[in-house]
């Protein structure tokens, strides 16, 4: 058997991982500006953590979860999304306690797992950036969180991203709308896809989210949930819209957007762009004011989003955005002869200890091959170290671009390499 990575996974090699690290670092710095701290939860959870919170009838639970019974016969699942594990952690670690400053703001970066058909920007193991804010019902929290994602896209230079906005209202609003949707869809039940016929019985709002052609046709003239918002829900949504306007964040109202998870209420949103003439959601989230209570915690408002890293990098690539990740070395040491091996190690280590990026030859190659490596690594300077240099205690350091050289002692290299670099950069 040829050993290969499982279908729907990827190896992120050093040339690409630098781009991932750059995007992750920009995200971390953006989130810090909004007073978010990092949280890390397990990659696997008890099955009920996901099934009960995400919803037993969702595609995630019924079709896409990686779940198994471990050796202790515990029902375990690899996490398919980030919010439920974070809420579980919030409750388990009593972050709702009065001594913990509110709102509690956390972000996470990690792998998620769903058994889906692999395609561009959608893998079975995918990576997600996410944020969760606990303890604020203020619509300003909704807008601040959306603005944080908007700022991240702007910082990365991403263009042509549209904010889609909707409200699911509170429980009373959703119940009224649910019945209106059932009344509308029931006469055309037979024209719906098999999945949506099931959804009509279990969770009719999910029909609005279907990607099947026949379902899209069926819901074209469906009633709008915005017509069923009560006064509280309407006020919340109006304030969100007014604040987005005040921050000059453009948006479109998308009344058919319901999100694929059961725990949302009030504001929901997606950032959508077009790739190869197809719509691609790169960030999505919303408000969930009952989820903490559902996990056994006190009544606690919540708001957050998830953002797919693979999709974000795909958009950056398709839009031709060059990330500033070109790697280079400060110095490359070419080593001539076994007699210079030990001294080369001492030199390269001392330069690294001074805070510089350094590499040396380990393979005993010809000098031409070593110089080629220096060029490949984009080394700013090159030191050639042979047995004669070891004996004299003096080496030549060459600027790899201008070919200018300076002669320096080992002592100067090992104690003050910064000065040597400055000499060559004049």
From Swiss-Prot:
Q: Which UniProt keywords apply?
A: Aminoacyl-tRNA synthetase, ATP-binding, Cytoplasm, Ligase, Nucleotide-binding, Protein biosynthesis
Recorded GO molecular functions are: ATP binding; catalytic activity, acting on a protein; histidine-tRNA ligase activity; transferase activity
Q: Which reaction does it catalyse?
A: tRNA(His) + L-histidine + ATP = L-histidyl-tRNA(His) + AMP + diphosphate + H(+)
Give the subcellular location.
Cytoplasm
Which superkingdom does the taxonomy of this entry point to? Bacteria
**GO BP annotations listed:** histidyl-tRNA aminoacylation
Identify this protein by name: Histidine--tRNA ligase
Q: Which organism is it from?
A: Streptococcus thermophilus (strain ATCC BAA-250 / LMG 18311)
């Amino acid at each position: 058997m040829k050993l290969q990575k499982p279908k729907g996974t990827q190896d992120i090699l050093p040339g690409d991982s630098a781009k991932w690290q750059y995007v992750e670092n920009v995200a971390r710095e953006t989130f810090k500006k909004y007073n978010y701290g990092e949280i890390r939860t397990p990659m696997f959870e008890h099955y009920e953590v996901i099934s009960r919170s995400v919803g037993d009838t969702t595609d995630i639970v019924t079709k896409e979860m990686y779940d198994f019974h471990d050796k202790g016969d515990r029902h375990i699942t690899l996490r398919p999304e980030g919010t439920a594990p974070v809420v579980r952690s919030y409750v388990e670690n009593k972050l709702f306690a009065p001594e913990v400053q509110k709102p509690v703001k956390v972000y996470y970066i990690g792998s998620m797992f769903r058994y889906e058909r692999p395609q561009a920007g959608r893998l079975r193991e995918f990576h997600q950036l996410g944020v969760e804010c606990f303890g604020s019902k203020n619509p300003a929290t909704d807008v601040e969180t959306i603005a944080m994602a908007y700022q991240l896209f702007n910082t990365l230079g991403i263009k042509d991203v549209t904010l889609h906005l909707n409200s699911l209202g509170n429980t009373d609003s959703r119940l009224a709308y649910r019945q209106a949707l059932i009344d509308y869809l029931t006469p055309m039940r037979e024209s719906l896809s098999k999945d949506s016929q099931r959804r009509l019985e279990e969770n009719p709002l999910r029909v609005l989210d279907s990607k099947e052609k026949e379902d899209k046709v069926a819901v074209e003239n469906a009633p709008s949930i915005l017509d069923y918002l009560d006064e509280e829900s309407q006020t919340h949504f109006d304030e969100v819209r007014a604040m987005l306007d005040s921050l000059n964040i453009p948006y479109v109202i998308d009344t058919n957007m319901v999100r694929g998870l059961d725990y949302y209420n009030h504001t929901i949103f997606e950032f959508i762009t077009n790739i190869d003439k197809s719509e691609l959601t790169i960030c999505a989230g919303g408000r969930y004011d009952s989820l903490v209570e559902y996990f056994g915690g006190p009544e606690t408002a919540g708001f957050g989003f998830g953002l797919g890293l693979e999709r974000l990098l795909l958009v950056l690539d398709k839009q031709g955005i060059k990330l500033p990740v070109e790697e280079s070395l400060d110095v490359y040491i070419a080593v001539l002869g076994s007699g210079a091996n030990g001294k080369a190690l001492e030199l390269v280590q001392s330069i690294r200890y001074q805070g510089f990026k350094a590499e040396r030859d380990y393979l005993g190659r010809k000098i031409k091959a070593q110089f080629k490596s220096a060029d490949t690594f984009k080394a700013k300077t090159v030191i050639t170290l042979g047995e004669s240099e070891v004996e004299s205690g003096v080496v030549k350091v060459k600027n790899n671009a201008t070919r200018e050289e300076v002669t320096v002692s080992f002592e100067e290299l090992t104690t003050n390499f910064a000065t040597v670099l400055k000499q060559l950069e004049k």
